[in-house]
């Protein structure tokens, strides 16, 4: 019975990155032997155990054989005669197929350390194409390690393209697609995830709303990058610079989907694309079962981002109506979120990356002004019922009007 550290812990250690979770593989042991040593079994489909003290996961070495469609169609075989090399062979990428024993020695039968040095994401074997989820996982790793200059091996990208064209991605559940997307949105370069999906054809399958933006032009004066799909990923990259919140990143990515609905005869103008895109974002979020908080912000950003770009020209009545519409009184964080998504949109353009975005500060300051209006004073003045809301609105508009006079 031998125990090895495997997977991400070994990979990240070799990259001198922080090691968060440790996974172990046990060779030459049976489930009963693990139980006798105090381990707690938690795996149903294959034997995975929790260490009695560290509670880290220890999995018995196993092989996997394709027995059905999709990412769940596998039959696992786990027994004391399964070797470490056989267990590592079932893993997705060579950089994830490195093991380390208690003495610090590496078992690296598939060249993972060499690929780490070459900054290469390469599949272990042809069995890679048996699990369609791996297309998304590789895209996520590309996003996670883009800042270290990792790239996908040509042969791996070709395999991902073949997997997409085979229709296997249609067997992925919405929950798994969203989980990988959610993790990708947390990476330093989330735009790389979606670019890789486009490169292998998967974007059209999983995110057609985004894929449909490619080839849709915008006015060169305002969008030197011209292509709306390119702009969407540039805006996402800027959102990642401005905020760690995936709510902001997600909302920024899909803010322009309504432009795909513009008739070609009206190109490159896209008047009204914000409200037009709201049903598309709603359908996307329902299909992928996106959490409500992310969905709600994305819907608001899609509808109102153009209004925020012209916020300094808007009358006080429009500003108060905007704060009402986004429910800022109960969810004040939305003001900052909408300011940041709009800034990411504005700066996510070729040549605009380092420009200031005064509209964001204007929106925040306007919010500070309306917040200074006291609800208690309105109630104390004798207003009741709906009259309280009406008087609050009147006073907020008056406060903004006075503020705008001195701008």
Swiss-Prot record:
Q: Which Gene3D superfamilies match?
A: Beta Polymerase, domain 2, cca-adding enzyme, domain 2
User: How many and how are cofactors bound here?
Assistant: Magnesium is required for nucleotidyltransferase activity. Nickel for phosphatase activity.
What does the entry list as the binding residues for CTP? 8, 11, 91, 137, 140
Key words of the record: ATP-binding, Hydrolase, Magnesium, Metal-binding, Multifunctional enzyme, Nickel, Nucleotide-binding, Nucleotidyltransferase, RNA repair, RNA-binding, Transferase, tRNA processing
Q: Which residues bind Mg(2+)?
A: 21, 23
Q: Mind listing the GO biological process terms from this record?
A: RNA repair; tRNA 3'-terminal CCA addition
Q: Which residues bind ATP?
A: 8, 11, 91, 137, 140
Q: Which GO terms describe its molecular function?
A: ATP binding; CCA tRNA nucleotidyltransferase activity; cyclic-nucleotide phosphodiesterase activity; magnesium ion binding; phosphatase activity; tRNA binding
Organism of origin: Erwinia tasmaniensis (strain DSM 17950 / CFBP 7177 / CIP 109463 / NCPPB 4357 / Et1/99)
Query: What does the subunit comment say?
Result: Monomer. Can also form homodimers and oligomers.
Task: List the HAMAP family.
Answer: CCA_bact_type1, CCA_bact_type2
What cofactor does this chain's UniProt record say it requires? Mg(2+); Ni(2+)
Briefly state the protein's biological role: Catalyzes the addition and repair of the essential 3'-terminal CCA sequence in tRNAs without using a nucleic acid template. Adds these three nucleotides in the order of C, C, and A to the tRNA nucleotide-73, using CTP and ATP as substrates and producing inorganic pyrophosphate. tRNA 3'-terminal CCA addition is required both for tRNA processing and repair. Also involved in tRNA surveillance by mediating tandem CCA addition to generate a CCACCA at the 3' terminus of unstable tRNAs. While stable tRNAs receive only 3'-terminal CCA, unstable tRNAs are marked with CCACCA and rapidly degraded.
Q: What is this protein called?
A: Multifunctional CCA protein
Q: Which InterPro entries match?
A: CCA_bact, HD_domain, NT_sf, PolA_pol_head_dom, PolyA_RNA-bd, tRNA_CCA-adding_enzyme
Other observations noted: A single active site specifically recognizes both ATP and CTP and is responsible for their addition.
EC number(s)? 2.7.7.72, 3.1.3.-, 3.1.4.-
Give the UniProt family note.
Belongs to the tRNA nucleotidyltransferase/poly(A) polymerase family. Bacterial CCA-adding enzyme type 1 subfamily.
The segment(s) forming the HD domain are 228-329
> Superkingdom of the source?
Bacteria
Q: What is known of its domains?
A: Comprises two domains: an N-terminal domain containing the nucleotidyltransferase activity and a C-terminal HD domain associated with both phosphodiesterase and phosphatase activities.
- KW Metal-binding (keyword) present: yes
Question: What is the catalytic activity of this protein?
Answer: a tRNA precursor + 2 CTP + ATP = a tRNA with a 3' CCA end + 3 diphosphate; a tRNA with a 3' CCA end + 2 CTP + ATP = a tRNA with a 3' CCACCA end + 3 diphosphate
